[in-house]
Amino acid sequence: MKRMLSGIKPTGRVTLGNYIGAIKPFVSYQDEYEMIVFVANLHSMTIYQEPKDLSDVLEHAQLGWYLGCMVSMGELSRMTQYKDKASKLKKDESIGAGIFNYPSLMNADILIYDPDYVPVGEDQKQHCELARDIAERFNNRYSETFKLPEPLVPKVGGRIMDLQNPTKKMSKSDETGKGCIYILDDINVSKKKIMSAVTDSDNAIYYDVKNKPGISNLLTIYSILSGESIDALVERYQGVGYGQFKKDLAEVVGNELQKIHDKYNEINQGNYIDTILNEGADKARYMARKKLAKVERKIGITIKK
């Protein structure tokens, strides 16, 4: 069975975009792949966090250092996340080294488990491609060690956009919260956000990301949550106004969120989540230690007895 790996940062509240683009697909992927999903808590330290346990699998950080020695400053400075942060800096602000070196740790997160595929949004594809480059560079220098992972970009739903500004991605860091649906928020509030989502003035429902980004984004959300294709939705809503379309979509979103709330409340009882995390950490730690030991033998830093 092929192996798939993905991680989620534990910062901010989970959005509908996170759910559609990453969490929901994990459920279907686990039937087809050996899934490894981790909480990227070391990545969260690029912004201040309350002190707590650093990580269950510290081997990520160790491998991140080794791989960081094989990546150039030019490669790191070309990463979209760094460029985006740099472009938004105010005069008295600076970027921490953690943001600049972020891709090195991401390379380690990926390569330490030898995945065949890494599901990513279009905006994260660059990071997976860098991981492939570094893996190939390491393999050429020290002999075959890492698999070259393939980025898996979903055709639909990989990038859910802001409801108030559909030219930018729905983000946990949305300052107003008006364009972002948080999956554990009050369901009626989320429905109202769908009803007030920005569209356009021609009141025609069809998919055209360039000219109709708002309605195209809503069609994507509707399609993913209902299981109905975008083409089928467009045909069904021919001659129907945006108001009815949004009302129907709000019900679909509300029903999906209700299922999430029910499941969340069910598994949030007792020690169920801690048990799953601990069992997963034990398995991941074994795999990571094995790979790290192999890397250290290759680069010659193991202590000879």
Predicted regions span which residues?
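Short helix-capping/linker segments at secondary-structure and domain boundaries
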Residues: M73-S77, I112-P119, I224-L233
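Short, Lys/Arg-enriched, disordered terminal segments
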Residues: M1-K2, K305
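Conserved aromatic-histidine-acidic binding/catalytic patches
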Residues: Q49, P119-E122, Y206, Y237
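Short, histidine-centered active-site or binding-site loop motifs used for metal coordination
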Residues: I8-P10, N41-H43, D116-Y117, D174, ...
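A conserved hydrophobic position in a structured secondary element of the catalytic/binding core
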Residues: A40, Y113, D185
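Conserved nucleotide- and phosphate/pyrophosphate-binding catalytic cores
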Residues: L16-N18, Q126, R132-K305
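Classical nucleotidyltransferase
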Residues: L63-W65, R78-D84, K91-P166
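N-terminal Rossmann-like or analogous alpha/beta NTP/dinucleotide-binding catalytic cores
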Residues: K2-A108, V252, L257, H261, ...
